[in-house]
């Protein structure tokens, strides 16, 4: 039997602390990221049992989910939000955990902050009480979301019981066409696998189209691994990864970095390793993507007609499509460009990094947001905001009629003041288009930052390729 291993298996095996017969192994956890929503009860549990945080140096907290993007006033998003943020401050102070609070220069969305500070490194196990922790897998780390009781367990022990997952390889062969982004790639993947196709698996994304991506693009892809049902998504580290890491606040320096890179270079799937499942896509066939339904797998190319429920052979998919079309207020056979958008949101842990800001600004420059559209640009962190302002992107956005906001999760989820009203239609760069995700009865269409900016200007969805050809 071959000893060849996948990248996931290498990282998993390296972190097994205890493997008792008949039980799931206990894994050591290298980094624990904490935010205000899923941590209060976990800290309460420590307090009740008289426990400390086992490794404060490996635990980092920030405020992101329910912060206001219009003011640094802790009261702005309502009483529950204020309580959660104040509680996080008290808990971090009491237990000695590093906190990047509302007024800190490193505050931001947890999955933007971790990578940009060098907290996230290849080969690590990383957890957070948040669904989209898979983002960090872009660095070749095993990163996944956990529940609040597990947050307490990791705070107390720096370990977690974790069953071995099945492995899936998603191979995006060849190069994408001009103007096709990481968001289009991952939406096309989910369109093929469906929103449940990765259930029970840890996915490794491979292929030329993936290795061609920048680190920010790779984070977008891994961020949405959970949206095809996977436990986590990984991309093997390479020179692109090492160049991104070098010089960041918590990254290894000098000789330590050289030694780390030597180890990180071994973090790749062995040539003869076998995956439990393989999915292949032709990158050249991927077009700009827009979701039409109420899960990320209900997605089409921007120039394709809205599908008819009867086009689905599976009765469950057919029923789901009927329900989604009714909720979204769409008619099969029509084009998504036939429908006006009311709001546009560029942000979230999927697409709020500096390259996302630049992509949206390139479309916004010299143009104007349609009069009936409210368009928000929400940088993912204070660091992203500062860099964007240094480059003058905020001025481009404001002159075009976009709102330039403060960092936070914002309109990705209805936990702060940025939300949709009933039946409002939104072009959003976030990761979930579930019913009510952005506000009760709100209608969410997931797109790339460039596609979102273009929709803001046209007032409806347009094929980004027609705009870039004119530019």
Curated annotation (Swiss-Prot):
Cofactor comment: Binds 1 [4Fe-4S] cluster per subunit.
Known partners and oligomeric status: Heterodimer of LeuC and LeuD.
Catalytic activity: (2R,3S)-3-isopropylmalate = (2S)-2-isopropylmalate
Designated name of the protein: 3-isopropylmalate dehydratase large subunit
Name of the top EC class for this enzyme: lyase
Family the entry assigns: Belongs to the aconitase/IPM isomerase family. LeuC type 1 subfamily.
GO annotation terms (biological process): L-leucine biosynthetic process
Entry's Gene Ontology molecular function annotations: 3-isopropylmalate dehydratase activity; 4 iron, 4 sulfur cluster binding; metal ion binding
PANTHER family (UniProt xref): 3-ISOPROPYLMALATE DEHYDRATASE, HOMOACONITASE, MITOCHONDRIAL-RELATED
Top-level taxon of the source organism: Bacteria
Residues the record lists as binding [4Fe-4S] cluster: 349, 409, 412
UniProt cross-references to PROSITE patterns, sorted A to Z: ACONITASE_1, ACONITASE_2
Pathway stated in the Swiss-Prot or TrEMBL entry: Amino-acid biosynthesis; L-leucine biosynthesis; L-leucine from 3-methyl-2-oxobutanoate: step 2/4
Signal peptide (UniProt feature, chain positions): none
Keyword Flavoprotein attached: no
Phylogenetic placement of the source organism: Bacteria, Pseudomonadati, Pseudomonadota, Gammaproteobacteria, Vibrionales
Reported cofactor(s): [4Fe-4S] cluster
Function: Catalyzes the isomerization between 2-isopropylmalate and 3-isopropylmalate, via the formation of 2-isopropylmaleate.
Enzyme Commission designation: 4.2.1.33
Keyword Repeat appears in the UniProt entry: no
Entry keyword set: 4Fe-4S, Amino-acid biosynthesis, Branched-chain amino acid biosynthesis, Iron, Iron-sulfur, Leucine biosynthesis, Lyase, Metal-binding
């Amino acid at each position: 039997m071959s000893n060849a291993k996948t990248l996931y298996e290498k990282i998993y095996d390296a972190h097994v602390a205890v493997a008792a017969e008949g039980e799931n192994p206990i894994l050591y956890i290298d980094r624990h990221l904490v935010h205000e929503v899923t941590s209060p009860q976990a800290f309460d549990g420590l307090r009740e049992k008289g426990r400390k945080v086992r490794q404060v140096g490996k635990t980092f907290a920030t405020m992101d989910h329910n912060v206001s993007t219009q003011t640094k006033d802790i009261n702005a998003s309502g009483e529950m939000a204020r309580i959660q943020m104040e509680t996080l401050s008290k808990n971090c102070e009491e237990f000695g955990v590093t906190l990047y609070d509302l007024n800190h220069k490193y505050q931001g969305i947890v999955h933007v902050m971790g990578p940009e500070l060098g907290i996230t490194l290849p080969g690590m196990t990383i957890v957070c009480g948040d669904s989209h922790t898979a983002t960090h897998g872009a660095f070749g780390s095993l990163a996944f979301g956990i529940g609040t009781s597990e947050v307490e367990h990791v705070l107390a022990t720096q370990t977690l019981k974790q069953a071995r997952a099945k492995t899936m390889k998603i191979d995006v062969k060849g190069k994408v066409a001009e103007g096709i982004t990481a968001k289009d790639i991952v939406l096309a993947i989910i369109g093929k696998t469906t929103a449940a196709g990765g259930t029970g698996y840890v996915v490794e994304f491979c292929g030329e189209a993936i290795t061609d991506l920048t680190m920010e693009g790779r984070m977008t892809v891994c961020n949405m691994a959970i949206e095809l049902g996977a436990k986590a998504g990984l991309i093997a580290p390479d020179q692109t990864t090492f160049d991104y890491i070098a010089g960041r606040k918590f990254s290894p320096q000098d000789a330590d970095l050289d030694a780390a890179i030597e180890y990180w270079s071994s973090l790749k799937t062995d040539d003869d390793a076998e995956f439990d499942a393989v999915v292949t896509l032709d990158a050249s066939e991927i077009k700009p993507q827009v979701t039409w339904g109420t899960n990320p797998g209900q997605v089409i190319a921007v120039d394709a007609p809205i599908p008819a429920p009867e086009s689905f052979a599976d009765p469950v998919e057919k029923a789901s499509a009927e329900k989604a079309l009714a909720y979204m207020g769409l008619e099969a056979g029509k084009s998504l460009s036939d429908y006006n958008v009311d709001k546009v949101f560029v942000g979230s842990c999927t697409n709020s990094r500096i390259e996302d800001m630049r992509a949206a600004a390139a479309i916004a420059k010299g143009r104007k947001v349609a009069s009936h559209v409210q368009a928000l640009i929400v940088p993912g962190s204070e660091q992203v905001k500062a860099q964007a302002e240094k480059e003058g992107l905020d001025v481009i956005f404001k002159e075009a009629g976009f709102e330039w906001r403060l960092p936070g999760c914002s309109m990705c989820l209805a936990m702060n003041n940025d939300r949709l009203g009933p039946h409002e239609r939104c072009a959003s760069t976030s990761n979930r288009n579930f019913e009510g995700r952005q506000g009760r009865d709100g209608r969410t269409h997931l797109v790339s930052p460039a596609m979102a900016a273009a929709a803001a200007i046209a007032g409806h969805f347009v094929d980004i390729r027609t705009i870039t050809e004119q530019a």
